Curated annotation (Swiss-Prot):
Gene coding for it: hemH
Presence of keyword Metal-binding: yes
InterPro entries, A to Z: Ferrochelatase, Ferrochelatase_AS, Ferrochelatase_C, Ferrochelatase_N
Annotated family: Belongs to the ferrochelatase family.
Keywords from the UniProt entry: Cytoplasm, Heme biosynthesis, Iron, Lyase, Metal-binding, Porphyrin biosynthesis
Principal EC category: lyase
Binding sites annotated in the UniProt record for Fe cation: H207, E288
Record PANTHER family: FERROCHELATASE, FERROCHELATASE, MITOCHONDRIAL
A Pfam family hit: Ferrochelatase
Main location: cytoplasm
Protein name per UniProt: Ferrochelatase
Organism of provenance: Helicobacter pylori (strain P12)
Length: 334
């Protein structure tokens, strides 16, 4: 009987000690296996924030056509990445580090297009009797296609849990934070590895968007341009000159007009220079950074006989980024 009472007391003590606030890192996700490539594409192209066709039937039809045209190519890409996206395991490692550094909160993550979905994560947090939540967008710049889509999904999932009504706060953008930009600049310098910065063209590559989405009021392009200007100011303050500092857009899909210039276009244009690329719109490495920037465009750079072509890693699960997230959460206003 004493043993049973002791175990019950331990459970009560653990419950009392367990954090009452949870931070959910929100990202797009990526296939956790080759089987999930189809799931990933289906969920992405059924998202009205991605494929902005108001008629549900038409959106599903167009989405199915895109999926059928891309699924085999996408599987080959993920085969080259070891059969899955690196995004989920890196995000898991980041939350492990966050929980070690800040045991006063519980850090977890939810993905938009692949498990773990927001609905699954929120059900778990309801069982943990969490009292407050922070939805932390992992996209530095705001866009309806990423940030708003993730928040909409998370809030809808929360509404479906009728008995779980925690207090919710959000972090929807953080690109203007000087501490973040110092980490980015240090990552660039680390990748240069004592090479002279003035010998390189620095390209900040971000995920592209159809121009029609920006024309409809999305602030993404404006925020990306502002982010680059802030980084240029910081480089000037720290006396770190580059041959040129440019912004480009990658991952164009389909025949419609997208934001320009493209990353490919700038690599071609500066073929006589050394090039270093930083993936400015991504915080966690994924197929667009590892395959597109570091494999596909590296082959292009070799064909163009570019002497040095460097690609910076994302912030990933670095201790600097983890500390930045913790500080942003601590400083979040009520």
């Amino acid at each position: 009987m004493n043993l049973i009472n002791e175990k019950l007391n331990n459970l009560e003590n653990n419950a009392a000690k367990s954090p009452k606030e949870a931070v959910i890192l929100l990202n797009m996700g990526g296939p956790n296996s080759l089987y999930e490539v189809g799931v990933f594409l289906k969920n992405m192209f059924d998202d009205p924030f991605i494929l902005t066709i108001k008629n549900n039937f038409m959106r599903k039809m167009v989405g199915k056509m895109i999926i059928n045209s891309r699924i085999e190519k996408s599987k080959k890409i993920y085969e080259k990445l070891g059969g899955k996206s690196p995004l989920t395991p890196i995000t898991f490692a980041l939350t492990e580090r966050l929980n070690e550094l800040d045991p006063s909160r519980f850090y977890t993550y939810a993905m938009r297009y692949t498990p773990p979905y927001a609905s699954m994560v929120l059900q778990d947090l309801a069982l943990k009797e969490v009292e407050s939540l922070v939805f932390f967008s992992m996209y530095p710049q705001y866009s309806s296609t990423t940030t708003l889509s993730s928040f909409n999904d998370a809030f809808n999932a929360l509404k479906s849990l009728e008995t779980f009504r925690p207090k919710v706060r959000v972090i929807e953008r953080f690109y203007a934070d000087k501490k973040l930009n110092e980490i980015i600049l240090n990552t660039i310098l680390s990748t240069l590895n004592n090479r002279k910065s003035q010998d390189f063209v620095l390209i900040f590559s971000v995920h592209g968007l159809p121009k029609s989405i920006v024309d409809a009021g999305d602030t993404y392009q404006q925020e990306c341009e502002h982010h680059v200007s802030l980084l240029k100011e910081l480089m000037q303050q720290k006396n770190i000159p580059f041959k040129e500092v440019l912004l480009s857009y990658q991952s164009k899909l389909g025949p419609m007009k997208w934001l320009e210039p493209s990353t490919e276009e700038l690599i071609e244009k500066h073929r006589k220079s050394n090039i270093i690329i930083y993936p400015l719109a991504f915080t966690i490495d994924n197929s667009e950074t590892i395959y597109e920037l570091d494999m596909q465009y590296r082959l292009m750079a070799e064909r163009l006989a570019i002497k040095e072509y460097l690609v910076c890693p994302c912030l990933n699960d670095s201790i600097e980024f983890a500390k930045f997230i913790i500080e942003r959460v601590k400083n979040l206003k009520e």
